[in-house]
Design a protein with these regions (language model features):
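Non-catalytic linker/capping segments at the edges of enzyme domains
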Residues: 1-76
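HotDog/MaoC-like acyl-thioester-processing domains
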Residues: 2-22, 131-180
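Hydrophobic, Leu/Ile/Phe/Ala-enriched alpha-helical segments that form helix-helix packing faces
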Residues: 30, 86-93, 161
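Short amphipathic beta-strand and strand-loop transition segments with alternating hydrophobic
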Residues: 38-48, 124-129, 141-146
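A generic structural signal for short, non-catalytic loop/turn and secondary-structure boundary residues
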Residues: 48-50, 114-121, 164-166
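A structural detector for beta-sheet-dominated domains
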Residues: 58-62, 129, 176-178
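A short mixed-secondary-structure module that forms the rim of ligand-binding clefts
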Residues: 71-89
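Hydrophobic beta-strand-centered segment that forms part of the acyl-chain substrate-binding groove
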Residues: 91-138
C-alpha cells in the first residue's frame, strides 16, 4: 500500500476545522449510536490537486452497533469509520468545488439525496498492524487517484487509523461514485 505523500515545500498547507453541524448533517443517515466520527479537519495545499485534499478525524466507538464489545477495532468498524470520514470529505469537496470530477455532477442537495445509493465501495483492503483502542482514535483519509467515465467516477483512496498508543490500521479503498 503506497500512501506516502510528498509535499512540495513551496506549497503552503491550510488546515480548517469542519463544523460539527456539517459533520452531523452528512452523517444523518446513520443511527445516532453509530455516528463514530466526532470531529473532522481538512487540509489542502495551494496546488489543489486531489492528492493534497486530506481529512483528519477524531473517532469514538463507545459500544458496537452490531455486536458485543470485542475490545478492539475490527474490519466492520474500519468500514463504517471509512464511510463516515469519506462522506464528510466528499461533501466538503463538493460544497467547495475542490474536485471537478465530482462537482460537475453533484451539488449539495444531490449529494445528500444520493450519498447512500450512489457511493459504492468497489474494492476494500484493510490491515491491522496492532490492536487499536476503539474507544478513542484518529483517522486520516485521502485520495490516490481519480478517473471519470461517462457513468461513474472511480476514486482510489487510503484511510489509516491510529490511537494514542500503538494501535494501527491501514487500508485502501476504491470507490465507484455513480453519476446522479
Amino acid at each position: 500500500m503506497n500512501t506516502l505523500r510528498m509535499v512540495d515545500p513551496r506549497d503552503s498547507i491550510r488546515v480548517s476545522t469542519i463544523d460539527d453541524g456539517f459533520v452531523g448533517k452528512v452523517l444523518q443517515p446513520y443511527y445516532e449510536h453509530s455516528r463514530y466520527l466526532k470531529h473532522a479537519s481538512f487540509q489542502q495545499t495551494d496546488s489543489l490537486e486531489p492528492q493534497s485534499l486530506i481529512m483528519n478525524g477524531e473517532f469514538a466507538i463507545p459500544e458496537s452497533c452490531y455486536i458485543d464489545d470485542t475490545g478492539h477495532f475490527n474490519a466492520v468498524e474500519y468500514n463504517i469509520c471509512f464511510n463516515q470520514i469519506c462522506y464528510v470529505h466528499m461533501a466538503h469537496c463538493i460544497k467547495n468545488a475542490l474536485i471537478p470530477e465530482l462537482s460537475d455532477d453533484y451539488d449539495m442537495d444531490t449529494f445528500y439525496e444520493k450519498q447512500l445509493p450512489n457511493v459504492l465501495i468497489a474494492k476494500l483492503a484493510s490491515s491491522y498492524q496492532s490492536q487499536l483502542n476503539a474507544k478513542h482514535f484518529y483517522g486520516t483519509y485521502g485520495i490516490n487517484a481519480i478517473k471519470k467515465t461517462s457513468k461513474c467516477t472511480f476514486i482510489k483512496t487510503y484511510c489509516h487509523f491510529h490511537d494514542d498508543g500503538d494501535g494501527r490500521s491501514t487500508g485502501e479503498v476504491t470507490l465507484a461514485v455513480l453519476a446522479p
